[in-house]
Regions:
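Asparagine-rich low-complexity intrinsically disordered tracts
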Residues: 70-71, 92-93, 97, 174, ...
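Short, intrinsically disordered, charge-balanced linker/junction segments flanking boundaries
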Residues: 195-200
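N-lobe entry segment of adenylate-forming
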Residues: 1-75, 79-86, 180-187
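Structural core segment of the AMP-binding/adenylate-forming
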Residues: 117-194
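Short hydrophobic segments within beta-strands
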Residues: 64-66, 105, 129, 151
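A generic secondary-structure signal
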Residues: 51-52, 86, 90-94, 140-144, ...
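Conserved AMP-binding/adenylate-forming
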Residues: 73, 90-133
Length: 200
């Protein structure tokens, strides 16, 4: 192994916030396969958000998002960090444990990004489902993944069509709605919109 190559990747590893620094920097394997930092552990939220705040970029914009109504949402790193922390706290309050499995049902929205980064922040395994998936396709994934919680942007009509029977069959699954219109169902947790979404 070329020492120069290893030193190059060792230097690049300093860019990353590690929970556990890797000892294996760059490994060449059979059939021209390579691995980088294979024994290191990191958290994506720490590297996407915390690192930028620590580098004095907290007042810089992290996300520009345009919704279907052409409303523009611009959020700075510090604001985004607060939203992620608030949603992380919400997930903890509904008794999710470390290593919980989460299904996030939603389009490429701002709330979906918050949900993903909150799950990463807490160490929850998560999978994102497209909003357009049919009820049958969602059921297959629920049976396969066996999530502890489903997070969705579904409003009442879509909830009744896609999720009502799933929750009836899987009584242990929690359901969180961050719909603009409240979903009427005893099993649904509502998001405090003041703490979560800041559309400007």
């Amino acid at each position: 192994m070329d020492v120069e190559v290893k030193n190059f990747w060792k230097e690049k590893s300093n860019i990353i916030n590690w929970k556990r620094k890797p000892k294996k920097i760059f490994t060449e394997k059979k059939n021209n396969k390579f691995t980088w930092y294979e024994d290191g552990i990191l958290n994506i939220k720490s590297n996407c958000i915390d690192k930028n705040i620590n580098d004095n970029l907290g007042e810089k914009y992290a996300i520009h998002y345009i919704d279907k109504q052409k409303n523009i949402l611009s959020v700075k790193y510090k604001e985004l960090n607060n939203l992620i922390n608030n949603f992380s706290l919400f997930l903890k309050k509904i008794n999710l444990k470390k290593n919980s499995k989460v299904l996030i049902h939603g389009s490429s929205s701002f709330e979906t990004s918050i949900s993903m980064l909150s799950c990463a922040n807490l160490g929850y395994s998560h999978c994102v489902l497209f909003q357009e998936l049919s009820k049958e396709a969602i059921e297959v994934r629920v049976d396969l993944i066996k999530p502890d919680i489903i997070i969705s942007r579904s409003e009442q009509k879509e909830f009744d069509l896609k999720f009502k029977s799933i929750l009836r069959k899987n009584k242990k699954i929690k359901f969180v709605s961050f719909s603009n219109k409240p979903v009427k169902n005893k099993k649904v947790f509502k998001i405090n919109k003041n703490n979560f979404t800041k559309f400007k």
